[in-house]
Amino acid sequence: MKIKRILFFILLAAIVLTIPGPGELQLLAAKSKAPLTLVIDAGHGGADGGAEAADGTQEAELNLAIAKAIQSEGEKKGVKVIMTRETADGLYGEGNLEKHWRKLEDMKCRKEIIASSGADVAVTIHMNCFKTDGNVRGAQVFYPKTGNAEILSASESLAGSIQSALIKGLDDGSNRSQMGRGQIYLLENPTIPTVLVECGFLSNPEDLGRLKQEKWQQKIAECILEGILACIEI
């Protein structure tokens, strides 16, 4: 009788340990869907070129190149990819001439695409820039800090998985850590797990040189996709 009781408690403990935490539910639910649906947002575009390197390289064009590489790799693996933009243009009407209103309309449009997509996760692609210190470098992933607790936890898990894949795959010695970040429009109150990937620093000569290379862009894309798939366990 005593042995049966011990076995019962061992079995109960095993069941409790395998129950997913609240933050994992969103990502685990995605495993049952076929195919995985992913929104890729290439940051900036149009009149908004984003950060600019000393040599004139604009963030928006690099964002789009990496976003398209993720799209291509994802589709090869059976992932359904929704792009917020596929051209150099921004997502705003021609009638809005003031920069502030163009930017606001652009961001609202991106958020609406994500919210109405029915996607499992969303990743927005950006480049960092820190002109006061050109030594700062490396890719870094950010996750939201405000919103639904389960989505926030799932976003944090996703950010960690992508960051790990970038550190391992790029192997550039930067080893940055994923971080929560507020006051980013697309990261505020997300409707699905969402992260922002800063792929490197345009202000760092070494990062910039690599980011302009198609092979490095492809490598970043593969790492990001690997991190997504590892987290969702496709």
Model-derived features with residue positions:
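Periplasmic OmpA-like peptidoglycan-binding domain that tethers envelope proteins to the cell wall
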Residues: 53-61, 206-207
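Active-site-proximal helix/loop segments of hydrolytic enzymes
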Residues: 4-9, 17-33, 64-234
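Short glycine-rich His-centered loop
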Residues: 36-56
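Acidic active-site catalytic centers that drive phospho-/nucleotidyl reactions
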Residues: 41, 48, 59, 124-126, ...
